[in-house]
C-alpha cells in the first residue's frame, strides 16, 4: 500500500521531478524537503505523517561540493534546534565533486546507476527503511547525453521505474526550457511520473512585497499528482527568509487582490472594502478575491483524511 510521508507531495514508491530554470530554487527547495522528511518535520502546510518513522534520505549532488551541502544542512540543524531530537545519520550525501577527478560514474551508464542503487541498498540494510533518493540534477549527473532525444532517456527512466518497483522513492531535479513552462527534453522523462513540480520566479504583478535583498520568492505549482486533491493544484508562492532560513506560504495574488487581503486581515469586512469609486474595489472583485482566498484553505481531501498512515494538510 502507498504510505505518505508528507501528503500529498511525497510517499513511498513515488517518482517525482522538480524542474525550474537555473537559479530559481530547485536545490534550495529539494534540500529543505529532503531534510524535513528525514527528520519527521512539517514543511509549511505539508504535515509529516507522525504515524510512521522518518525515512532516511540519500541526496546525490552533481554540482556542489560536500562542504557546501553540509553547510546548508548545518544551517537547517541550527534553525530547527529544539524542535526535536535530530538523527543526522538519517541524511546521507553522495557528491560528484568529492570523487577523484570528479570520476563518479555518470547515471547514463549502468555502473553509475548501480552505484546509486547499491548505496540505497546499503542504507536499507543499515536502517531497515528504504531511503528517499534525490538526484540533483539530471544534467550534471547523467553526463554526456542529448536530453532532447527520447532514446537517451530510456535507460534512466526504466531504472527509475525499477527503483519504484523495489519500493524506493526518487525525486530528480531538472532544468526547464527557456520559457520555464516545461522541463527540458523530449517529454519521455515525464511519462512515468507520479509527481511533477514546477518552480519559477513570481512575475512582477504577483510577487509579494518582501525585499529581494533579504528574501527569496519561489512560485510552486504541481503540474501532475498521483491524486488530484481539491486546492492542492493551486499555485502558491514560497517566501524564504535568507537570514532565518524560514519558509512561508502566500497565495498568488495580483496587487489589487493583495491590497484587499491586507484589509481583510486587518479586520475589515467586505462591506467596508467595497467602493465602486476606487479602482479594483468593486463588489464583484472584492467577493471574487474573498472566494479565491477561501479556496486556498480548502485543500483537505475529505475522502482521504481518515485513511490509515496518511496526514492530509
Spans of model-derived segments:
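Conserved, well-folded catalytic cores of nucleic-acid-processing
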Residues: 36-40, 76, 141-144, 163, ...
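C-terminal regions of RecA-like/P-loop NTPase motor modules
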Residues: 126-129, 165, 205-313
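Phosphate-binding/switch region of NTP-binding enzymes
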Residues: 17-18, 23, 28, 151-243
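Amphipathic alpha-helical transducer elements in NTP-driven molecular machines
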Residues: 3, 66, 70, 110-117, ...
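The Walker A/P-loop phosphate-binding site
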Residues: 1-78, 83
